[in-house]
C-alpha cells in the first residue's frame, strides 16, 4: 500500500485520465469501471432493469472467448446441445438444496396472455434440472456413458445491485453437464474443466488465478464439491472467474438418471456441471485496465493492431489506402487489424479513442514514414513510441504481441502477490481485509464461523488452494484465525471481499 492508502502499483494518471473523461481508479474505482464499459463501447444500459445491451466491440470480445473454449470442448469429445429457456417450476423443486439456493433469484412465468398457468415456469437460472430430466429418458446402459454435453446461452438470476458483466439479471455463459458411471471419472472431469479454465486465463487472458476447492458454505446449491478459479481485481476484490461442480448422485436420484451396469444392476449416474460466464469480461477490464481505459490482452482482443493513417486533406485518402495495404500484410499473419480511416476526426482523438478501447498496438503511418520505409509503433501499455523499419515492424508483430501478453501476466501476478497477506491473528485478519487485501489464514471449516467472519469483515472464503496450485499451495497446520479450533484443511484458506 502507498502512504495515502492507495493500492501498490496503482495506475494513477489523474491528469491524463481527466482529460479523456475517465474517472481515475484511485478516485473512484466503481465510477472508473462503469465509465470504461460505456465509453469503450463494450456495453450500455437497457430499458430492462438489470439487463445490459452488449455492443459490437463487447460482442466481438465474447465471440473470441466462445471460439477458444468451444474448439477445446469439441476437441475433448464434448457435444453441444440447446435446451429451452423456460423450465417447469416443479423441476426446480425436486432437489431440495438446489431450490433453497436459487429461490430468491428466480424469474417466474405465471401467465400466457391473461390466462393463468396451472404449472408456472422459471426462466433458466442454470440447467441441471431440465438436463437431468432429459437424461433420464436417454440413458439406459453403461454403454451410453459418459454423456459429455454443453450449451451456450443466457441465464436469469434476479440481481438488486447490478454491474455490467459482473452482476446482471441476465448474463451469458456456457454450461457443461456430464454424466459418468463412477465417482472417479466424474471427479476427473470436474478437474479437467477447471484446469482448462485456468489455462485459458493464464495463456490467453493473461489473468493469474488461484485454483482450489470451495468451502461447504460456498458450494453450489446441490453439489457435493465445488471448485473455482479466483482472480484479484485492481481494487483488491476477488472475482470468481469460473467454477466446476461434482454433483455426486444428487441430481441423478432426483431425476431418475440411472443405467444398467455390466453386472445387470441399476446404478445412478455421477454427474458434473461447469461454467465460465460473461463475468470474465469484467475480470479482463478490472485486472488490466488503467486510467486511460481498457488494456486488452492481445490473444483475445477483438482488434490486435490499429493502423492510423496520418495525412493532410489532399493526401488523406491515399494514406488510408496505404494503411489498408499495411493491414493486409498484418492480416496475412493471422492478426486482427483495424484501419481508422475516419475523416474529419483529429489524430489526437483517434489515439485517445483506441487507448480507451485498449487495442494492444497502434501504428501511425504518414507520408514521410511511407517515403522513409518506416512505421511509428506504440504499445498500449507504454508511453514510448518506436520508429522501426517497416519490414521489421511487420515481421515482428506477433512476437511483440506475445511480449505484451507476458508483461500483462507478470504485472497482474506481481500485484496479486503484493496484495495478499498471511496472518495468524484475527486483529491482523481484519486490518488486512480493511486495507483491501486478500488474506491467507487457517480456518476450522465450520459454516457458523465463516458466517461470523463475513458479518465482521464482509470477507468470504474464496477457496482452499489445490496442492498443485500456482499460488498458495503450501500445506501446514494451525488454529482457526477466528475461533482457535484446529484447522480443517491442512493448509490456509484464501479470504477476500468479492464481486
Curated annotation (Swiss-Prot):
Pfam families: HGTP_anticodon, ProRS-C_1, tRNA-synt_2b. It is an enzyme of class 6 (ligase). Residues 1-21 are annotated as: Disordered. Its EC number is 6.1.1.15. Keywords: Aminoacyl-tRNA synthetase, ATP-binding, Cytoplasm, Ligase, Nucleotide-binding, Protein biosynthesis. SUPFAM superfamilies: C-terminal domain of ProRS, Class II aaRS ABD-related, Class II aaRS and biotin synthetases. PROSITE patterns: AA_TRNA_LIGASE_II. Residues 1-17 have a biased composition (Basic and acidic residues). Its main location: cytoplasm. One of its GO terms (cellular component) is cytoplasm. GO terms for biological process: prolyl-tRNA aminoacylation. It is found in: Cytoplasm. Transmembrane segments: none annotated. It catalyses: tRNA(Pro) + L-proline + ATP = L-prolyl-tRNA(Pro) + AMP + diphosphate. One of its GO terms (molecular function) is ATP binding. Homodimer. HAMAP family: Pro_tRNA_synth_type3. Consists of three domains: the N-terminal catalytic domain, the anticodon-binding domain and the C-terminal extension. Belongs to the class-II aminoacyl-tRNA synthetase family. ProS type 3 subfamily. Catalyzes the attachment of proline to tRNA(Pro) in a two-step reaction: proline is first activated by ATP to form Pro-AMP and then transferred to the acceptor end of tRNA(Pro). Can inadvertently accommodate and process cysteine. This is Proline--tRNA ligase. It comes from Deinococcus radiodurans (strain ATCC 13939 / DSM 20539 / JCM 16871 / CCUG 27074 / LMG 4051 / NBRC 15346 / NCIMB 9279 / VKM B-1422 / R1). The lineage of its organism: Bacteria, Thermotogati, Deinococcota, Deinococci, Deinococcales. The gene is proS.
Amino acid at each position: 500500500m502507498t502512504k495515502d492508502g492507495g493500492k501498490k502499483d496503482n495506475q494513477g494518471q489523474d491528469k491524463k485520465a481527466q482529460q479523456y473523461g475517465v474517472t481515475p481508479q484511485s478516485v473512484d474505482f466503481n465510477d472508473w469501471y462503469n465509465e470504461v464499459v460505456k465509453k469503450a463501447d463494450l456495453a450500455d444500459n437497457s430499458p430492462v432493469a438489470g439487463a445490459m445491451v452488449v455492443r459490437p466491440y463487447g460482442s466481438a470480445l465474447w465471440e473470441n472467448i466462445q471460439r477458444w473454449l468451444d474448439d477445446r470442448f469439441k476437441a475433448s469429445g464434448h457435444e453441444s446441445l440447446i435446451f429451452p429457456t423456460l423450465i417447469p417450476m416443479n423441476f426446480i423443486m425436486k432437489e431440495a438444496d438446489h431450490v433453497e439456493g436459487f429461490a430468491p433469484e428466480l424469474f417466474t412465468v405465471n401467465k400466457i396472455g391473461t390466462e393463468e398457468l396451472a404449472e408456472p415456469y422459471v426462466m433458466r437460472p442454470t440447467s441441471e434440472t431440465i438436463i437431468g430430466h432429459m437424461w433420464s429418458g436417454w440413458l439406459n446402459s453403461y454403454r451410453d456413458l459418459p454423456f459429455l454435453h454443453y450449451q451456450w446461452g443466457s441465464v436469469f438470476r434476479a440481481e438488486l445491485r447490478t454491474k455490467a458483466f459482473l452482476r446482471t439479471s441476465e448474463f451469458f455463459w456456457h454450461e457443461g453437464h456430464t454424466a459418468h458411471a463412477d465417482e472417479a471419472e466424474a471427479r476427473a472431469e470436474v478437474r479437467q474443466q477447471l484446469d482448462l479454465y485456468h489455462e485459458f486465463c493464464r495463456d490467453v487472458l493473461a489473468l493469474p488465478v488461484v485454483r482450489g476447492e470451495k468451502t461447504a458454505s460456498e458450494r453450489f446449491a446441490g453439489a457435493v464439491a465445488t471448485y473455482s478459479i479466483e482472480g484479484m481485481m485492481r481494487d483488491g476484490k476477488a472475482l470468481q472467474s469460473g467454477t466446476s461442480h461434482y454433483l455426486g448422485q444428487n441430481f441423478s436420484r432426483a431425476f431418475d438418471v440411472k443405467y444398467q451396469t455390466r453386472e445387470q444392476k441399476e446404478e445412478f449416474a455421477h454427474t458434473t456441471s461447469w461454467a465460465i460466464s460473461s463475468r470474465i469480461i469484467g475480470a479482463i477490464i478490472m485486472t488490466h485496465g488503467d486510467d486511460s481505459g481498457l488494456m486488452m490482452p492481445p490473444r483475445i482482443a477483438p482488434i490486435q493492431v490499429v493502423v492510423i493513417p496520418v495525412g493532410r486533406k489532399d493526401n488523406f485518402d491515399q494514406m488510408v489506402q496505404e494503411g489498408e495495404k499495411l493491414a493486409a500484410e498484418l492480416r496475412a499473419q493471422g492478426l486482427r487489424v483495424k484501419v481508422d480511416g475516419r475523416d474529419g476526426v483529429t489524430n489526437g482523438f483517434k489515439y485517445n479513442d483506441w487507448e480507451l478501447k485498449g487495442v494492444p498496438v497502434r501504428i501511425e503511418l504518414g507520408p514521410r514514414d511511407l517515403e522513409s520505409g518506416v512505421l511509428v509503433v506504440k504499445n498500449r501499455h507504454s508511453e514510448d513510441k518506436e520508429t522501426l523499419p517497416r519490414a521489421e515492424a511487420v515481421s515482428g508483430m506477433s512476437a511483440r504481441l506475445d511480449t505484451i501478453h507476458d508483461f500483462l501476466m507478470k504485472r497482474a501476478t506481481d500485484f496479486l502477490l503484493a496484495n495478499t497477506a498471511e496472518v495468524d491473528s484475527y486483529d491482523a485478519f481484519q486490518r488486512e481485509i480493511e486495507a483491501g487485501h486478500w488474506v491467507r489464514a487457517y480456518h476450522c471449516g465450520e459454516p457458523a464461523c465463516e458466517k461470523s467472519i463475513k458479518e465482521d469483515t464482509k470477507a468470504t472464503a474464496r477457496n482452499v488452494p489445490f496442492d498443485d496450485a500456482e499460488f498458495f499451495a503450501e500445506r501446514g497446520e494451525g488454529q482457526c484465525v477466528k475461533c482457535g479450533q484446529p484447522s480443517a484443511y491442512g493448509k490456509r484458506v484464501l479470504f477476500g471481499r468479492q464481486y
